[in-house]
Amino acid sequence: MENNAPVPKLLLQLISSAFQRCRLAEDLCRLSVLLDQSTERDPPITCISIADTGIGCNLEEFQNLRCPREFNGAKIWDGLLSVKTTCFTDDEVYYYHINLDEYIANKRLKRQPSQAKNGAKFSGTEVSLSVFGSMDVLVAPIIGFFQKIIVLQILNVTLDLMVKQGTSPGNQTQYVFAVNADKTPCFTASNLERLKSGLEDYVLRHANCLDTMCDYCFSDREHLKVGSGTVCQEDKHKRVGGTMEVVIVISDLLESTQHCSRSCNGKTEVLYFDNFLPSPVPHLALSALKKIDWKKYGLILANVNDQDGHVFLEWDNFPSYVQIQIALHWYHNQYPTRQKNGPGISLLKKGIKNALDNLKAKHEGFLLSSHSRKICSYVPDLARSIAGLIFSSTDLDFQGDCLSVLGFQTQEVERDTVENYIQRKIVTVIGMNERKPQKDQEAAPFLFFDGESETSFFEDEEVEGEYYSSSLE
């Protein structure tokens, strides 16, 4: 089987349904996937089990599943799903066989003899099937799916994958996927707070390939710059509304990152989640990303690389030591729902822009446009001149008044302290003015005096390719 083979896609559909059943349950749940390959046959056959302790399945989940028995001329499976399921209130465990090759409804599903629970109270579902082909083609997509799904930090669900090849205990491998215990939001945290925390971990642990933060690339999570945005779509007529959440994490890598084989290559990965499940980035989201005015944030988008829904953004003149990660999550206000409507371009653009503006507002002099960066390049000299005027004056009353205006209570303050403070204030005002609508920017007042001069002190020369202003030291 190849990477685009139908069986891995079918498995991810079945795992997605199992995860939703666990997420909707009120209790702690477990989702376990077992791949048990017999090496005695040629080609080898793999028995697959997807088990969860969620709310119990609705057989309608299997109505639209399709998976051919053959791929590229070779038989890949027998087309049969075995399902056993029960709800907490049921007295029995129900067994079914589902033939995915059958299109006639009453022939597609066959009920098997059920089993009494003898008064036991539990719920859960197990789906089993057998396939032919390479184990690697099955394992890699499942691991990638689990690595992304824990970004959402759904705390009541634990995930594990067991891989067996042959009967020897040495040929068994177990993968357990868990959220970072050191930085876990509480159960009452909002979906957005969970997404922010989960994306931070995803960055620090190199796409969750590591169990802990990469010490080569990061010192601690406090150095991450995080912005978030939310846009809501109200219910309208018979259309169920939804919420678009966007989180952007930007990090400066340590110099030792050159020793890390997993360090970033300057590209920005875009993660997309649809109703709490990892999903390929839809075309509307791609269009929204292309329509963002990235230059307003000091970024120059060079290319959008779409690899079957796995999307990377590439930048021009981008610092090699900077990493950007973007996560988009769209979910309906009511779930489950039969509607498949997603967010429009305008909603996606607004969510991304809100996250960028939030990041910009939280960090002074960060993500400034090229024009504002040019203005900021003059700020150190301006602050140095103002501080010089204050401290060179022999009029102590004048000094005291100036320091008081700046918020200092004593004339014993150091000149460097005053100079740095003036720099920060000017950069803050520049950033605030840049976040205003364009019509308000044009009428922005002067920083230190009232004036009506329309003289421009700076040319419109572009300074591109820088993502934040020079450090204020």
Curated annotation (Swiss-Prot):
GO BP annotations, alphabetical order: embryo sac morphogenesis; meiotic DNA double-strand break formation; pollen sperm cell differentiation; protein-containing complex assembly; reciprocal meiotic recombination
Superkingdom of the organism of origin: Eukaryota
Entry GO MF terms: DNA topoisomerase type II (double strand cut, ATP-hydrolyzing) activity; protein-macromolecule adaptor activity
Knockout-associated phenotype: Defective in meiosis. Sterility due to male and female gamete developmental defects leading to disturbed embryo sac development and abnormal pollen formation. Strong reduction in bivalent formation at metaphase I caused by defects in meiotic double-strand breaks (DSB) formation. Impaired homologous chromosome synapsis and recombination.
InterPro entries: MTOPVIB_plant
Tissues expressing this chain: Expressed ubiquitously in different tissues, including roots, stems, leaves, seedlings, inflorescences, siliques and pollen grains, specially as a higher level in inflorescence.
Residue intervals passing through the bilayer: none
Keywords per UniProt: Chromosome, Cytoplasm, Meiosis, Nucleus
Subcellular location, record wording: Chromosome; Nucleus; Cytoplasm
The protein's role, per its UniProt record: Component of a topoisomerase 6 complex specifically required for meiotic recombination. Together with SPO11 (SPO11-1 and SPO11-2), mediates DNA cleavage that forms the double-strand breaks (DSB) that initiate meiotic recombination. The complex promotes relaxation of negative and positive supercoiled DNA and DNA decatenation through cleavage and ligation cycles.
Family as reported in the entry's similarity comment: Belongs to the TOP6B-like family.
Complex and partners: Heterotetramer of 2 SPO11 (SPO11-1 and/or SPO11-2) and 2 MTOPVIB chains. Interacts with SPO11-1 and SPO11-2. Binds to PRD1.
Name of the molecule in the record: Type 2 DNA topoisomerase 6 subunit B-like
Gene name of the encoded protein: MTOPVIB
